[in-house]
Amino acid sequence: MLKTILAFDTSMSVCSISLLHKNRKYNIQKECRNNHTLYLLPMIHEILKKNHVSLNEINIIATSKGPGSFSGVRIALAVAQGISLGLNLPHVISLSTILIMAEQVWNNHKISKVLAIITVNKTSVYWIQYSRNFHGLWIKKSKAIILNLSKALEKILSLKKQWALVGNGWDKFPKNILKKIFITNITFPNSKYIISLISANSIYQKKEVLHKIIPIYLNER
């Protein structure tokens, strides 16, 4: 049986908090925009209180490490550090936001090829592709790169087979171009899929010392 896990994500505009306790999952989400610091700790308190779980019962802290906004990723890692130090848990689990969204695609649609296109600014997007193997592991099928819109469009047109699209960058391209892609409308990570990944495979249970986690930012502020 898995231990009690507190998982959260603030890498994009939504604050997402999840709890696994006695094999039951709980989840709350809220649109936070750039106010993650105002919402994250109260939401953690809320999910624990509603489910009658004390902070001291938490065995594992898990969060996303990006790619995401500079402030959002930093806030999540800072809160993870604060809670883990308070509970004397020197290690945390950190997962890519793309893996979290890919796992949601698999859970909801059973599509094993996932393309992430995330807006960086008005003229460029973050691009990466993952494929799920028979063991439930997500394997990179491309490098993570920043592309201008014309180059990204070229890559979309060259895609073979069906890919599920996640991220908020799809609206930068003509809808008729995207017909060969399954648009999932998954534009941000839901932290309950952090717990799904951890539960599914020991590969995703790897814990790290916080200062060794390398965050991935989509911008510099």
Curated annotation (Swiss-Prot):
CDD domains: ASKHA_NBD_TsaB (cd24032). Its main location: cytoplasm. It comes from the Bacteria. It is found in: Cytoplasm. Keywords: Cytoplasm, tRNA processing. One of its GO terms (biological process) is tRNA threonylcarbamoyladenosine modification. GO terms for cellular component: cytosol. InterPro entries: ATPase_NBD, Gcp-like_dom, T6A_TsaB. Transmembrane segments: none annotated. Belongs to the KAE1 / TsaD family. TsaB subfamily. Required for the formation of a threonylcarbamoyl group on adenosine at position 37 (t(6)A37) in tRNAs that read codons beginning with adenine. Is involved in the transfer of the threonylcarbamoyl moiety of threonylcarbamoyl-AMP (TC-AMP) to the N6 group of A37, together with TsaD and TsaE; this reaction does not require ATP in vitro. TsaB seems to play an indirect role in the t(6)A biosynthesis pathway, possibly in regulating the core enzymatic function of TsaD. This is tRNA threonylcarbamoyladenosine biosynthesis protein TsaB. It comes from Buchnera aphidicola subsp. Baizongia pistaciae (strain Bp).
